[in-house]
Amino acid sequence: MSTFKNCISAAAAGVMSLALALPAAAAPTKFDFWFGLSGDLERVVQTMCKNFNESQKDYEVVCTSQGNYDATLQNTIAAFRAGKQPAVVQVYDAGTATMMLSGAYYPAGKLMSENGYKIDWNDYFPGIARYYATSKGELLSFPFNSSTALLYWNKDAFAKIGKTEAPKTWEDAAADMKALKGAGYDCPMAINISGNESWQLMEQFSALHNQPIATKNNGYDGLDARLEVNKTKFVKYVTDLKSWYDQGLIKIKSKELGQDMVQAFASGDCQMIMTSVGDHGTVGKTQKAGMNWDVAELPVYAGTERKNSLVGGASLWVLSGKSADEYKGAAAFLNFIHDPKTALFWSTNTGYIPVTNSGFEFMKSSGFYDKAPYKGREVAIASLTASEPTQITRGIRLGNFTQIRAEFGNQMQAIFANKVSVQEGIDNLAKNGNAVLERFEATYKGKQLP
């Protein structure tokens, strides 16, 4: 063997010996995050997870969609019983009471402080934080994907009736709908009356008018809360909606009927809808070419002192029973999500709103709201912060609330099909909903909400 080859062989042997002598790089600690978003939103979550994993080398989050919110909660309960629960899980607003009573979580504040992170909990918008907070104001989970309902209106159609602003009151909205009908528009406003629309129609209306949905401050003060929405201004509201429907001023739109509300508005078929700010991007991408439209806060009845609207969406819970290393990873992940730059990424790609004041200010300073397609989404923040949350407008803390929402849909269908009167339908909602609450109270007998 030549001297040159001997040198190469010796060098290679030396490198090999050095490599064997060095300790192997530690593999990152893996932990699971389960969530309920699908489609485009699932892809955005997966990108966010990828961004976190690439931002550091110590932890790797494995993000798995469970398909929808209900499945996520049910799968998490089953996994917890089998000792296979994820470290972090996304739980929708209606599941908050169940999570609080489960005791199966690691409180958000405790997690972050014990892992060396300083979070300004007062930075969260009150209208968002208090929906997920305990009765004493402590956040047990991290608000995540958040939205509220807005009025979408067709500026071109309103120009035909001499209007340049959206209606601020329901009295004005009624007059505008009649004028639009008179101007030849077949569908001045579209609504959906399914169970999912309880959030837009019953919950938002009640909050804006400071009207209770249930006793015990909407359930925050005890599991013995019972529905009383059949005794509030909500009855008048449904009466008016039904009257406007009978007059042809409102059309019911849904996927089951061939065209959902958002499609009906974006196509120019209907001139007003009430839906989530999360649909803002969808309208922008699918609107009829050249259509001028905007968003506004939902109307209230004349003489009403407007209160904050309610947040919708979900929060992130850290579950008990995981290792210290997994908790370190979970804390790092939640701190990453809390960063204003992540808020900008999230809102840009989803339509959800920032949950903290610092995130909102960062987005404003970045020019996010200055022009299309994002201009107008700041109205959602104005709606959520229209007032300091009251004992009623901080949120709804009722057990098995998804079942109550479904019952809302059943009774609204009966009302609009003339099977029952408005009062009878809402009385039935209260009666059947209270049976749900009684069963939930019995299940957690002896327990108290934190």
Segments predicted by a language model, with ranges:
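Hinge/lid segment of periplasmic solute-binding proteins
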Residues: 94-148, 200-207, 294-296, 371-372, ...
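Extracytoplasmic/periplasmic solute-binding protein
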Residues: 135-144, 149, 174-226, 242, ...
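Short, well-ordered beta-strand elements
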Residues: 27-38, 59-64, 88, 140, ...
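Extracytoplasmic/periplasmic substrate-recognition and gating elements
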Residues: 27, 82, 137-138, 159-161, ...
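Extracytoplasmic "Venus flytrap"/periplasmic binding protein-like
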Residues: 51-124, 131, 156-168, 263-264, ...
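Glycine-centered hinge/linker elements that transmit conformational signals in sensory
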Residues: 176-179, 220-254, 298
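Long, aromatic- and glycine/proline-rich binding clefts that accommodate carbohydrate-like moieties
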Residues: 293-300, 348-410, 414, 442-450
